[in-house]
């Protein structure tokens, strides 16, 4: 016996007649946003010399040691997780009263690292403790244990060094930490002239590339009048979109094909590495494997930003439900899991959220329960849907599964109180 979905209501029955199935010049959303300044990070690729790379590695070791010393002091309860207290204990050689800090008695090598880098590492430890205690107070976690940073993890995953505002860019010349690094070569353009507006960082990624992270202030737009769009995240179809004007499309299928090809090549290299006996050849193949992973990440990022640009330019609001990757991965096969994890739905969602905030667009994360199985015409649940690509209902509704789910996400959100103002706008646009 057929059954109505839990969120289907009388309002849903009215809205499903209002929301068109085909593209129409109606149902736009007036998005009034107060203009404000938001902080966004821009990446500039650096090309340091061999000597500068070695200096950065030494600075990273000193920053890691300072971080671990601060964590150890708080864990042993010899110091409180306070920035000023930890800074006085582990940063300066000479105190204000003229005495020398005993911490540096056998650790003079730390003084070779610039003070801003060690200071940011100590502040990072204090901020981590503050976040952990806040989560504990809000009962988000039951307990926590602050662990140390390891050299192995740093060599494998890279590092990030805070350099504050100790850099300048004039006439195409970038100087970072003048007393240590000096002039550093870079690719592209630097988003500031003179001194930066906020504290910057130097990052080394897992693939050995160095980046300068520059925070930049941007002003949001004040008003947009365009349709809103609901996005259904998935694996076979990464992003299915349905707009309030009836327009629909699927995005990310090309990305899936390219990422699958790269993963296939990685698997082939892995098999060759497992059978190889020559040490030098095995090292070369591991380097080749690392380059493939870097290509995988760059292809994914390029498609992410292309899709985000396409959506944010065409619509004034985005409805993007969270995709529970961890829960879904338990029910899928290994090959499908690799495809799902390669899409990086969480990273895409965070990027979309930041871009919507930057452009002053509506962004919300509604729930998506029963949106795939529910008929968008009669509200009945189709228990026989399974993994079918096409949705079919006894009422005669036949539609693409993912597009239909995206339409139901939009319909479900408009049926809630949060979408009440949007519904009024829709009705006004229909009557005018």
From Swiss-Prot:
BP term (GO), one: transposition
Keyword terms: DNA recombination, DNA-binding, Metal-binding, Transposition, Zinc
Annotated Pfam families: Cas12f1-like_TNB, HTH_OrfB_IS605
Stretches that traverse the bilayer: none
Entry binding sites for Zn(2+): 375, 378, 393, 395
Induction (record text): Expressed in the late phase of the viral replicative cycle.
Any one GO molecular function term: metal ion binding
Superkingdom assignment: Viruses
Family that this chain belongs to: In the N-terminal section; belongs to the transposase 2 family. In the C-terminal section; belongs to the transposase 35 family.
Protein name: Putative transposase A625R
Protein's organism: Paramecium bursaria Chlorella virus 1
């Amino acid at each position: 016996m057929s059954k109505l979905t839990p969120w289907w209501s009388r309002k849903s029955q009215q809205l499903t007649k209002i929301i068109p199935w085909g593209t129409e010049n109606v149902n736009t959303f007036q998005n009034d946003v107060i203009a404000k300044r938001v902080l966004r990070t821009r990446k500039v690729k650096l090309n340091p010399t061999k000597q500068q790379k070695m200096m950065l590695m030494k600075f990273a070791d000193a920053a890691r040691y300072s971080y671990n010393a601060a964590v150890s002091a708080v864990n042993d309860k010899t110091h409180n997780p306070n920035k000023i207290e930890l800074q006085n204990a582990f940063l300066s050689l000479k105190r204000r009263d003229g005495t020398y800090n005993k911490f540096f008695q056998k650790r003079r090598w730390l003084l070779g690292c610039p003070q801003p880098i060690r200071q940011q590492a100590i502040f990072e430890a204090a901020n981590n403790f503050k976040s952990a205690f806040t989560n504990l107070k809000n009962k988000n976690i039951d307990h926590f244990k602050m662990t140390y940073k390891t050299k192995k993890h740093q060599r494998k995953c890279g590092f990030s060094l805070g350099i504050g505002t100790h850099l300048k860019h004039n006439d195409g010349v970038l100087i970072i930490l003048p007393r240590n690094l000096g002039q550093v070569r870079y690719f592209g353009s630097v988003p500031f002239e003179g001194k930066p507006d906020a504290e910057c960082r130097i990052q080394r990624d897992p693939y050995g590339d160095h980046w300068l992270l520059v925070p930049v202030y941007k002003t949001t737009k004040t008003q947009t009048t365009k349709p809103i769009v609901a996005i259904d995240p998935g694996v076979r179809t990464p992003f299915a979109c349905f707009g309030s004007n009836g327009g629909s499309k699927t995005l990310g299928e090309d990305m899936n094909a390219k990422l699958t090809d790269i993963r296939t090549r990685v698997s082939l290299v892995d098999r060759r590495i497992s059978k190889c006996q020559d040490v030098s050849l095995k090292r070369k193949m591991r380097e080749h494997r690392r380059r493939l992973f870097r290509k995988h990440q760059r292809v994914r990022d390029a498609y992410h930003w292309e899709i985000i640009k396409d959506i944010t330019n065409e619509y004034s609001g985005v409805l993007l439900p969270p995709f529970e990757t961890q829960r879904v991965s338990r029910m899928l096969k290994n090959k499908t899991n690799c495809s799902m994890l390669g899409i990086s739905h969480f990273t895409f969602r965070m990027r979309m959220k930041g871009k919507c905030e930057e452009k002053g667009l509506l962004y919300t994360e509604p729930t998506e329960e029963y949106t795939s199985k529910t008929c968008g015409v009669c509200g009945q649940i189709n228990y026989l849907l399974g993994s079918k690509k096409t949705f079919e209902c006894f009422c005669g509704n036949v539609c693409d599964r993912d597009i239909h789910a995206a339409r139901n996400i939009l319909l479900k959100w408009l049926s809630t109180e949060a979408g009440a103002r949007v519904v009024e706008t829709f009705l006004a646009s229909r009557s005018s």
